[in-house]
Amino acid sequence: MHQSSFGGFAEPHPTDRLFFAVMPPPDVAERVASLAGQLREQLRLRGRPRPTGHLHVTLHHLGDFAGLPQQLVDGACAAAASVALPSFEARFDRVGSFRGRVGKHPFVLLGAERASGLAGLYGSLGMRLAAAGLARREPAFVPHVTLLYDALTIAPQPVEPFEWTVREFVLIHSLLGRTEYRVLGRWPLAAGA
């Protein structure tokens, strides 16, 4: 028996997720969503494409919580405000599947080999979060945009490139199970990369 379930004191069910992300501009997100729909048909995938407004590159996952931890939000916002980097170009030119839970493999748009701007932002933000005591152990950073989840796994293959200038990053509050994102903060990158 787990101590957390002893005497009816079960762990609260997570309802809220916090993460930092880069989101493509609306026109690029529309094109990515269109590609997801086309590839879903061509590759005979059954998973439902992610909503256009949810397409993003995760930089740092802060965790899943039962309720919104305001102290963590405040600390994360302060750490993000200390990031000082120029804007940069992001390029995504392949699709493929990651390993996931059985029957639920992420089918993703993958960053080009020269994703140094995203890696730099990931590293800089990670250092600020660590300095604030908010660092989490995370897997290696692989820039990607999740298009859908599916039982099939697809080998990496090239697609027509998607490019945009990354001018900001955001802190997102995801309401788990409700397919709802709330942007809690935006931090601009300096112009003229």
Predicted regions and their residues:
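Histidine-dependent nucleotide/RNA phosphoesterase domain, centered on the 2H-phosphoesterase fold
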Residues: 1-193
